[in-house]
C-alpha cells in the first residue's frame, strides 16, 4: 500500500536541493510535476526535468518577483483552461541560446539574485515564468501556487522550477505511474490537497498563538 510523503518531508527535500513530485486533484489536471527550488536550479536538476519530466520547464514565482523583474503577462486575455499565468519568456544576458540545461539553470538562478534587474534578461527566451496567486493553493489549486507555497514554507526564495511529467508513450503520467517513478528515483511525492491541509493547520496554529499572546488592551 503506497503512502504519500508528508509536507514536512517535502520541505526537507527542497531545502536539501532535491526535486520532489507534486500532484494535483484527479478532477483537475490529474498530473504530476517535478519541482525544485530556484536556488537549486542546477544543471543536473534541469537536465533531469528535461530528460525524465519531458514537459515544459517553467518558473513559478510570487507577485513581488514578477514586478521586480518587470515581467508582463504573455497575453492580455488569458484563455488557458486553468488560467496558468504565463509572463513573457526570458533568458539571462549571460547565456547564449538559453536553451541548454546549463543556461536555463543560469537564468533561473539569476532571477532570484537580490541584484537582479529587468534589463538583465532578454525577451523572449527559454525560461517561462509563471505568476502565482497571492493566496497560493487556497486561491488556485495549481502547481504554480504549490511551488511558491512550498518554497515559502521551506524558508527558500519564493520561486522554483516545475515540469510536467510525461510517460514514454507521450501521454501524461497518472498516479500509479508517478508512484513508480517516485520509487525508482527515490523522490518525495506529495499532493496539493495535503499542502492545503498543512497550510490550514499551520496558519490556524499561528493564529491561536497570536491570540493567546494578545493582552486585554489589544482587543
Swiss-Prot record:
Homodimer. GO terms for biological process: riboflavin biosynthetic process. This is 3,4-dihydroxy-2-butanone 4-phosphate synthase. Its cofactor is Mg(2+); Mn(2+). Pathway: Cofactor biosynthesis; riboflavin biosynthesis; 2-hydroxy-3-oxobutyl phosphate from D-ribulose 5-phosphate: step 1/1. Belongs to the DHBP synthase family. It comes from the Archaea. The record marks 126, 164 as: Essential for catalytic activity. Its EC number is 4.1.99.12. It catalyses: D-ribulose 5-phosphate = (2S)-2-hydroxy-3-oxobutyl phosphate + formate + H(+). One of its GO terms (molecular function) is GTP cyclohydrolase II activity. Mg(2+) 2 binds at residues 29, 143. Keywords: Lyase, Magnesium, Manganese, Metal-binding, Riboflavin biosynthesis. Mg(2+) 1 binds at residue 29. GO terms for cellular component: cytosol. D-ribulose 5-phosphate binds at residues 28-29, 33, 140-144, 164. Gene3D superfamilies: DHBP synthase. The keyword Metal-binding applies. Binds 2 divalent metal cations per subunit. Magnesium or manganese. Catalyzes the conversion of D-ribulose 5-phosphate to formate and 3,4-dihydroxy-2-butanone 4-phosphate.
